[in-house]
């Protein structure tokens, strides 16, 4: 009980820390985060991200898999598991002859999982959903006010607190259900400074507090082939539900002409997009895994293009749409049971991962999606006893593949702490 309370305290503290970040430093940075809820954060732990983000059909009793709630029953029956991930990204933006560089760092996930009863398990955690971070400025010449400086800034993000339960039936079929609470603060601001001081500075913006309650369901089925080889198929579905919370739209013209308009988001008809995911994997014992995942998320009825603070301000046409992703990845362990000493034998116990992905954004800009393509590498170094490990992942990718879009080339890294212990064994005394 003491250990359980300690783990829960760490989780709650981490959730508070994530929420606090929305008012300060950037959790993510991209000019495309000006649209909607911002740039969607890649789901999953460092274990998932090292394999290109797959996990819908993955079952592994050594790692927590937060992509499919049905997967949590793949575990040792007496085990307590925890995962905490940190991540950062270096991005280079280019448009014509202009270049810019930015770095970000954020907590990626905190999750704990433990068994409840025979063939059942429970999981609770917190993870980012979207990031808003941008600072865009440019100048033009106006016939009346001479030179004008336009600046648009935004920061914040949304996070998801989740709790899930799952059960396995007939040793092959696993079903899970997850409750999601999404929360966060987003601030967007635009400023126009006129070169002629007789014209007042104009400021407008929105402060958003976003909340959402939703559910996610998952299923996995394992089919043994031969020996230790197993094919697993999996699917997930996340519900589309209303966005609640409140917003304040403000406009300022100089020091005296100020107007603030508060409103409730539940009255705007805003909705989160639903998401359907399917995956298939091939696993051979604990040594080899390869998986392909496809996800589709429909935001076309979210109404974000009709509500201030979510829609853009300017000539660019933003429209919510259907997002998709294709992911392929896997992992390999040379010899997990090699107990010999020496650096070579240590690396034979390590797990090595790789993956590729292609993402299509959940919106269009001037009629075109903002697509991403990337590759990932990862490894887990065994630490101490049981299945404790330190997972490290690298990511190389590019966003804005069309010649008319701002190109973002990024290098990301993630570090995950995988904690495993036996908490629920009963001791016999003579």
Describe every region a protein language model picked out.
Residues 21-430:
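Subset of outer-membrane beta-barrel
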Residues 4-14:
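Sec-dependent N-terminal signal peptides
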Residues 14-15, 80:
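Hydrophobic alpha-helical membrane context
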Residues 16-20:
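Sec/Tat signal peptide C-region and signal peptidase I cleavage site
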């Amino acid at each position: 009980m003491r250990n359980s309370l300690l783990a829960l305290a760490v989780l709650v503290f981490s959730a508070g820390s994530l929420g606090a970040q929305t008012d300060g430093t950037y959790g993510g940075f991209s000019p495309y985060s000006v649209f909607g809820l911002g740039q969607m954060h890649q789901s999953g732990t460092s274990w998932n991200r090292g394999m290109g983000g797959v996990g819908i059909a993955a079952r592994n009793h050594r790692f927590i898999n937060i992509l499919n709630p049905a997967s949590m029953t793949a575990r040792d029956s007496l085990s307590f598991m925890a995962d905490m991930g940190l991540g950062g990204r270096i991005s280079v933006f280019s448009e014509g002859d202009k270049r810019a560089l930015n770095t970000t760092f954020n907590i990626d996930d905190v999750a704990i999982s433990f068994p409840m009863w025979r063939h059942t398990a429970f999981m609770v955690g917190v993870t980012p959903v979207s990031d808003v971070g941008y600072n865009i400025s440019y100048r033009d010449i106006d016939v009346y006010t001479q030179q004008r400086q336009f600046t648009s800034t935004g920061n914040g993000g949304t996070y998801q607190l989740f709790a899930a339960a799952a059960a396995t039936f007939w040793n092959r079929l696993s079903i899970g259900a997850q409750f999601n609470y999404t929360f966060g603060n987003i601030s967007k601001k635009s400023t126009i400074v006129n070169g002629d001081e007789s014209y007042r500075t104009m400021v407008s913006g929105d402060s958003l507090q976003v909340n959402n309650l939703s559910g996610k369901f998952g299923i996995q089925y394992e089919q043994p082939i031969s020996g230790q080889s197993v094919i697993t198929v999996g699917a997930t579905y996340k519900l589309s539900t209303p966005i609640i919370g409140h917003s304040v739209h403000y406009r300022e013209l100089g020091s005296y002409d100020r107007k603030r308009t508060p409103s409730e988001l539940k009255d705007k008809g805003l909705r989160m997009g639903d998401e359907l995911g399917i995956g298939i994997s091939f696993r051979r014992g604990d040594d080899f895994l390869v998986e392909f995942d496809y996800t589709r998320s429909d935001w076309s009825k979210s109404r974000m293009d009709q509500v201030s603070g979510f829609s853009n301000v300017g000539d660019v046409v933003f429209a919510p749409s259907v997002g998709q992703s294709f992911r392929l990845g896997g992992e390999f362990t040379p010899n997990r049971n090699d107990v010999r000493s020496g650096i070579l034998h240590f690396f034979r116990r390590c797990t090595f991962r790789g993956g590729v992905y292609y993402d299509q954004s959940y919106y269009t800009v001037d009629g075109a999606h903002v697509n991403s393509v990337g590759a990932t590498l990862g490894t887990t170094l065994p630490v101490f006893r049981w299945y404790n490990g330190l997972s490290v992942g690298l990511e190389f990718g590019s966003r804005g593949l069309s010649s008319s879009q701002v190109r973002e080339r990024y290098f990301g890294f993630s570090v995950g702490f995988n904690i495993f212990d036996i908490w629920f064994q009963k001791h016999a005394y003579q």
